[in-house]
Amino acid sequence: MHKEGARSLYVISDFQKNMAGSQSVKADTGQHISLVQLKASTLPNVAVDSVALLSAIHRPGESEKLVVRLHNYAGETAEKIPLKLLVNGAQKALGSYTIKARAVQYDTITFSGLQAGWQRAEISLQDNPVTFDNQFYFSFNVRQQMPVLLIDGGTPNPYLNAVFAADPFFNARHVPDGNIDYASLNTYPLIVLSDLNAISTGLAQQLKTYVNKGGTLLVFPSNDADLTSYRALLEPLNAAYPEKLLIGDTKVSGINLQNQVFKNIFEDFPQNPDLPVVKKYYTLSSSSNNRSENIMFLPGRLPFWTGYSSGRGKVYVSAVALDEDFSNLPRHALFLPVMFRIALLSGHDQPLFYTLGADETIEVPPVQTNPKQLLKLVKQGQSIIPEVKQEEGSTLLYMADRLQETGIYDLKKQDSTVAVIAFNDNRSESDLSYLSGSELSALVPRAATVLASGKASLKSMVTESNFGLQLWKLCIILALIFLGVEIALIRFFKTDRQQVSQPV
């Protein structure tokens, strides 16, 4: 609309709070903005915001624990909201929840009976009348076997071979340090270095990339370690590195039972446990990494076996070589369960879900493609071709605005399924709270007007905003009323005079 040359812009909305930015709206010079706020009903709404699986590695037939984050976006308590978990179309859990107004509640759901392969999972709520956010999708892979890469100087370590041969779930592959396929490193959740006298610059750089992307690296120094090369590997990863070799009998003085590695290992820990005996060891440097945790320590709480968070991954460093000349650790009863726990904590699968519109980069294991073999996201007849970028150790997918519908998609290369990926809506839409008139006024420039809808029609509101309050109809009505009164008065007084003037 135009009013004396000025442009008028009308924005009609209920103005949910999630639409508001942190900065005020700027209007063009000569443009008048009118915000017409529709009156919205207050509706109850509960949604699943996110989920997380407690196990990093998923094994066939084993129990899984899923942490669910439930959010009540309404201003009143939600009573007994039914929730159902489906995995590959089969119901795995059922429950109901009462959540206080505007509250967040966490719950852990236990389920089992999974077969090897990709799992397509859905959480469903019954929460009427707002239903657009009643489904939450996620996916994960149950491995038939877990690959482990053992890198050494050319001679396999018998203790490591014995550990991973004890459980057929682990598929350990031995490779000498001069024959490593760097492109495949990202396919191994766990890489173990042992008996390497020196670590090459190229290997150190590749392992740094591997850890930053979420891999787990376990380092056992050799009998005669080149300490400079070990420092070049570990220092950039914010992990301790071996500094010097000390010879002398000592013993591990304690273990950190609070460390995740020892979770569920002991039913009842003895007061005087049998701990590894040490004949010689490397002193480990102090690390500035505040996310480090001792697994075992020597007298004076000197680190013996320690873990560090680095990038998206983990680094574990031992102060001894896997050799009985150093300690009896390789034959100790603690060695196998600790190694298993490190392996099972090492999973770095893809995220359980992605969010539509978040412009996230989707990272999958390396997939070789050519113009005739394109990667496609497929769901119930829909086929979307993402932009693909190859990086060392991974394939990156960029969706931009190609994807518009939530659900679970198969990432396919021709007829083979490379991965299964879940997408959900941004849960900011679930918050059905609205801006007040004062909050709207603070967001718009001085040249703007906030119009709150009421019983009046939108047409009358716009007319009043443009031309002011129109009184001409009222004036005409009042004029007619006054005219009628005047006519009545004239007739009354005229009749009265005639009656008075008549002779007696």
Positions of predicted regions on the chain:
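DG-centered beta-turn motif at the end of beta-strands
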Residues: 1-20, 214
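Acidic, S/T/G-rich, low-cysteine, solvent-exposed domains in lumenal/extracellular/periplasmic regions
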Residues: 17-35, 155-349, 381, 394, ...
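Proline/serine/threonine-rich low-complexity linkers at boundaries of modular beta-sandwich domains
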Residues: 34-48
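Short beta-strand segments of immunoglobulin-like
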Residues: 50-58, 350-355
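Beta-strand-rich binding/interaction modules
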Residues: 61-98, 105-110, 118-124, 161, ...
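Terminal connector regions
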Residues: 112-141
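Short beta-strand elements
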Residues: 132-151, 158, 417-431
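Membrane-embedded catalytic interface detector for glycan/lipid assembly enzymes
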Residues: 270, 308-314, 319-326, 331-493, ...
